[in-house]
């Protein structure tokens, strides 16, 4: 039986403790000693909002179908628990195993809207992960950004090790295989980032130089090494009939913001307006 990261005293003192205990219907449990990669999936908002998001459910199910990967979840804590974690020096933890987020191989953060940017910094700070990618060492998780806001990644570039540009079902398998191969060859963190940069749709900010005009607009942008492509192409799912989809989605114990069945009948928009991420 797993041990909860929070004591009964703390759980009884905070609002909606079910946000933090995990153990929901269809939550995936694995033996950490029998997987090669531990991935912590983060929706940087409160549990009720994150559990309403279908994209997280799709990737969670897809990753956990691999025997060599265990994907867990973490969400932004409410201010009451945020204060307790800081006061008691309890590191932010995943729901499934209640393990510290900083102990994972990857921390994947979906960036759905700009208003969650400060929550991303909160997640990193509470987890004890250095805020800036350049400050992270060999034992820190690789921090990945995904979701619609990665179409303009530069405002957050210094906080992420890499960005996945496009739809998540396409090249994560190649990224995991590259990580395993880099580990097998005793490669460094930098070696892995260079391997990752060769994968279509993966943008590694540290492998590029960006300069700006006085008004903040981009003046120059170019790769710093041969592994980084001149242009990162977004990844698209071309066959939705063959795309993974959760057969047993995680069912929360408390009421989610969208307290109903979620079905995807269409993705994106055919109009292609230049100001819109969906198009």
Show which residues each predicted segment covers.
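Conserved, mostly hydrophobic/aromatic
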Residues: 63, 107, 161, 269, ...
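N-terminal [4Fe-4S]-dependent radical SAM core
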Residues: 10-40, 47-48, 205, 211-262
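Helix-enriched interaction subdomains in cytosolic or periplasmic regions
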Residues: 1-16, 66
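Canonical Radical SAM [4Fe-4S] cluster-binding loop centered on the CxxxCxxC motif
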Residues: 53, 255-279
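Glycine-rich beta-alpha loop elements in corrinoid/cobalamin-binding modules
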Residues: 76-223
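Residue-level signal for short, function-critical loop segments
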Residues: 43-47, 113, 267
